Amino acid sequence: MSQQQQPSTRLATTICFMKSALETPERAALPPLLQGASNFRDVGGYPTAGGQRVRRGHVFRSDHLAALTETDVARLKALGVRHSLDFRGTAECTSTPYAIDGVERVALTIEPTVVARMQTLVAQGVVPSTEETVALMCETYRDFVNHNAGTYGRFMKHLLEQPTPQVFHCTAGKDRTGFAAALLLSALGVDRATIEHDYLLTNQLYKRDARLEGQGHPHVMKVLWQVQPEFLHAAFDAVDQQHGGMDDYLQGAIGLSPQELAELQRMLLED
């Protein structure tokens, strides 16, 4: 048997390990704040166009919470977090469940469609180039804008309805969560350059499963397990070109009234 994997076999291995990472709580590296969630961070502290700042200690973003240590849980509770808003898909939640005493998990399901798209390519024996993989990710972000607005609307409404600190997350805390953070910061008046800075922090913080190292096509894995400005730009372009801009998108597809936007800003901004 040849020791060199055929292209379709190698890509199938890539997808297999992606799905494994989506559905397992084990983590390879210790993060700076939470040992079991390397991409956990406060979305507060950023300046707005109106001269205010996003309040710290009220909203946090993260990768999944299924691998938290007892110390992590204690830290989460010390932060006052009472709700976790979970964007993971059905299989992810089933395979990697969590229950944290005193923290209510709210399911805001968005399936990881890029995995399904890659599986289709595997079935066709196709190995996408770096450019094609980037294009797949950009398509995923456009789908967030055009096909998942209802879910993101529920996310924003939940932030409005619950005054206590909350954390929102998906599996890696980079794509579904990254767009959610971009929406929230946009609603609060943070400029896009600053939003992009927050978005790209994932590349410094997120530690993927060590079993993924060396698996599949490196050029595919590099795209799938990092964030790139092009991904976020694709979402913003869809907002601008198909929905008339962020203000219209927030008040249209997302479903926030001007009064609700003002209340969100009152809750989460400070002088």
Locate predicted features.
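Low-complexity, intrinsically disordered transcriptional activation domains enriched in glutamine
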Residues: 4-6
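Ser/Thr-glycine-rich phosphate-binding loops at phosphate-binding pockets of nucleotides
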Residues: 172, 176-177
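Cys-dependent protein tyrosine phosphatase-like superfamily
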Residues: 2, 11-167, 179-271
